[in-house]
Amino acid sequence: MGIISHSIVQCGKWQAGPARRQVVFRVHRRCFKMSEALRHLKNGETDLSSLPSGLDSIPRRIHTARGVDDSFSYRHPVLPQVVVLSDAFCVCLAVVACIAWQRIYDTPDELSGALLLANIMAAGAFFLFPKNVPLLDIPDITKVSVQIRYLLPPVAFGEVVFCTVLVMLSWPFGVTVRMGMEWLTFVVAILFVERCVGTYILHTPTMTRRLARKVAIIGSGSEATQMATRINTRMQRMFRLVGTFDDQGGDSDGTVEELVLRAREDHIDAVIICFPPACGQQHVMDVLWRLRGVLADVYVVPSLMTEDCHGWPVERFGPFSLTVLQRRPLSEWDMLEKRAFDLTASVLLLLALAPLLTLVALAIKLDSRGPVLFCQPRQGFNNRYFNVFKFRSMYTDMSDLDAARQTSRTDPRVTRIGRWIRRLSIDELPQLFNVLRGEMSLVGPRPHAPQTRAGGQLLHEAMEEYVARHRVQPGITGWAQINGSRGELVTRDDLCRRVVLDLEYIRAWSIWLDIKIIFLTIKREIFSRNAF
């Protein structure tokens, strides 16, 4: 949130140095009314004096910190949800097996409907019963006592519902104890087999390496050494140390800048800042500023946060209690959910739009010489480069792969068909193939070519917060586009408005927001006046 707020500050007085960063992270710990700021920005009021007054008096952000206890466990971001889905599948399988068994056992026809309804309602009761999902942490998921605590209440509740429904619907025909025990036996047996298989899989070396979170430590001295030693000895099943980094050199594996570059190539889940207490909080804030584009959770030893830090959440990280400074914008589960939606929607769209795509390709081929598709390098997720697909809308000998010159409304490089498909945004449709390849999402910040400039500067130079856009997959459309921020980036203010909207989308992401943006794109943006 602090990066979003600072994006607005960036639109006004262009400051630099530690003083500006201190302002940024003060705002980072406060709730900022983005709607008011966006309203002023849309009206063209980019000076700080035009923003709502009292920015420094905004109430402190409220965090609901996870309880800190002495348990030596670690919450994997995806595993609990996978176990819940596996339980749901097993219960459905148990219901099917129970119904099949009851038919084989020559159940009276009068009871068939009642048994079917009782099985279904019991399964629903199991799903709806509140479960203690934190009990699915590593290594608790392999403990029998913990799993009994997790499974016993919903199974018992499902059994009660089964028996109650069966008695209410079939009391004239009589109900035997056997019928009540059948549901319980099948559910318990299948869940038991599931847990045995799951425990075996979790203990395999391959799965252990996959589930372990990759951790990097920033710092030097005894504190960093102690942290690294503990991770390498007592926490090997939960965490894997990728290295220690520090600008002072010594025995470290590189500098902070080298860590930032390495994070682009090698997935890193968490970064722990572990400086000696003498370094102070300001040094921590400077390092956090340099990590603003890193796709990882950032923690710090609480002893370094001595100044006005009680608003920051504290989490258990193995045996350590660490202060959370920065979170990944989307969890692994959120990313899986978004990816599943992208794949499903893009396949359906390609099938539905196949006739239109064929006609457009034929028109481009007849209109001018050259290929139908145009590939251009763009900077995407985690600052990695990929080739984006578009319908060719320019003459082949005038194409600009690096986008050193942005397209203008009366650009002579655009063909006749190209002007039409650009106006209707049809030239972007081949990017559905980028979505299938995993390089893009349907909704997200629009990717830019490496040499795109705003106000005569490269985008990442014109606005330091620009790199934070790359912490999520780029999209075919986005929140900025449906709010009118598209087209040519002429000034830094144009870039600022777009980045503010992109970061607001990242902060507020949900599947429903993606669906809303897609429908608003169809409604508003296809005939946008800013498209050319």
Curated annotation (Swiss-Prot):
- Specify the superkingdom: Bacteria
Record field: catalytic activity: di-trans,octa-cis-undecaprenyl phosphate + UDP-alpha-D-glucose = alpha-D-glucosyl di-trans,octa-cis-undecaprenyl diphosphate + UMP
List all membrane-crossing ranges: 81-101, 110-130, 155-175, 183-203, 344-364
Keywords, in A-Z order = Exopolysaccharide synthesis, Glycosyltransferase, Membrane, Transferase, Transmembrane, Transmembrane helix
Cellular component, GO annotation: membrane
Q: Which Pfam families match?
A: Bac_transf, CoA_binding_3
Enzyme Commission designation? 2.7.8.31
Where in or outside the cell it occurs: the entry states:
Membrane
Membrane topology term reads: Multi-pass membrane protein
Q: What InterPro entries has UniProt attached to this entry?
A: Bact_transf, EPS_sugar_tfrase
Q: Which biological process, per GO, is one annotated for this protein?
A: polysaccharide biosynthetic process
Which top EC class is given?
transferase
Sample GO molecular function, one term: glycosyltransferase activity
Function summary: Involved in the biosynthesis of the exopolysaccharide acetan, a water-soluble polysaccharide involved in production of bacterial cellulose (BC).
The family line of this record is: Belongs to the bacterial sugar transferase family.
> What's this protein's name?
Undecaprenyl-phosphate glucose phosphotransferase
Gene source species? Komagataeibacter xylinus (Gluconacetobacter xylinus)
